Amino acid sequence: GDISFANGDIVLPGTIICGKLPGKTMLITGGVHSGEYVGIQACVELGAELQPEKTVGTIVILKVLNRPAFENRAGSLGLSDGKNLNRVFPGNPNGTEMERLAWAMTKEVFPKVDYYIDLHSGDDFEDLTPYVYYAGKAAQEVMETSRKMAEQVDVPYMVRSMVSSGGAYNYAASRGIASILLERGG
């Protein structure tokens, strides 16, 4: 289905799985860069496979954040503004398309989640070795939990990021949300 933000101005394909037992909330996003299809496909498959009766807490999956560019096969930047969504967080409520999307995520989604996994892959033109970034510039507990999340991923490289704004997962970590960004190669 679709999930609406910003009073209905932003509509994204998503799935919310409410577990049988109460617990924390995990956000999983794909399509920050609309040409990174591996993360988008992983979100689609997760949304179809996860079962509420086997889930504790809530999982929110936003399958394609940069929906306009994805639907128009227009590359990974914002369709109307040419901006990289992963460089504009926390966003601006009166800004460009990507800045408004980042703002909606910052104000409407991040306050409701405890953990965040941002799925990426090599874009159309990239050839990447899989790796995972974890938040390294946040409160100590957030950094430690982010590192533990990253350690669960089977990739050859793990990188501690020292950035606290611009990217979705970095900004989320600066707001107290344990976060990782997974690059699955391309």
Regions found by a protein language model. Name each.
Residues 1-186:
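Structured catalytic-domain cores with a bias toward divalent-metal coordination
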